[in-house]
């Protein structure tokens, strides 16, 4: 496996990182710890060495800590995140960080990110509570090793955050062949890399959407749908690690196989342009930029928001309104009909989707 330089940190990593947000769960919606142990450790044994989790991923940090026990913690770079939007005072920062260290069964987190920064979160939390100085203190104390941020907002906001601090060592952005001009996009990738930051990629398959593309799109790809989507990213020298939120053994084994042959410049010019053209065609067809992160899962009405958006986007791709209506009705009591427009989901959405407005339109169409 061809390892890549991680910015100016002195670290190097396999091209594939294990994202711990979408872990396999059992019939009671509990993380399958035995599966996590076996799958993550096997990946590490085969060269993977970057593991990404977060405070707000339900059960993830605890599961990660257990899986990395028995000597595996020392074999990886461990990344986790500070949920800045949960801060009410500076003391909260230390309480959360110490809780994360306990969950992860470690005395330090290698790569520590401010989670899901936007202009609003920067101004109302990072600046208000001087979180950068807290991050620097945590680094000086040895509780974290490298300071970074993950991001969900406009390119202008990304540039503002980059410019605001000279000590950034890495960042994490959403990027795939569908999102080349969305949020930070390719321009943000190139800018961050030009400043010496390592760049970690999330949502390489757009929450799984790019793994199951229409036949017309699949036929355009130089290789399989998943492999082509990952290769599009690994082809770029600016990218240090591509995260994949793997939830099945098959996904993990397949992605490790793809990563074993990943290299910078692996695509021909024709292959690059073909994949970009496929993205253009898909982007023209769909209207809701949902990645199925399920941060909206806090809905007090238990509406299946991400599933509803997936149904609508799939309808736009394949034109099958009959199937879309049937899939929507199959949600039973979890359709958009129950929405009371409380706005809790909108506050949590990293894609800044006006969720209840979209739900209302979809219900009128499919309900």
Q: Where in this protein do the model-derived segments appear?
A:
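Conserved residues at the C-terminal ends of beta-strands
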Residues: 19, 54, 112-115, 150, ...
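Short hydrophobic/aromatic-enriched beta-strand-loop microsegments
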Residues: 74-78, 167-174, 263-270
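A short, structured active-site edge motif that brings together acidic residues
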Residues: 74-86, 112-115
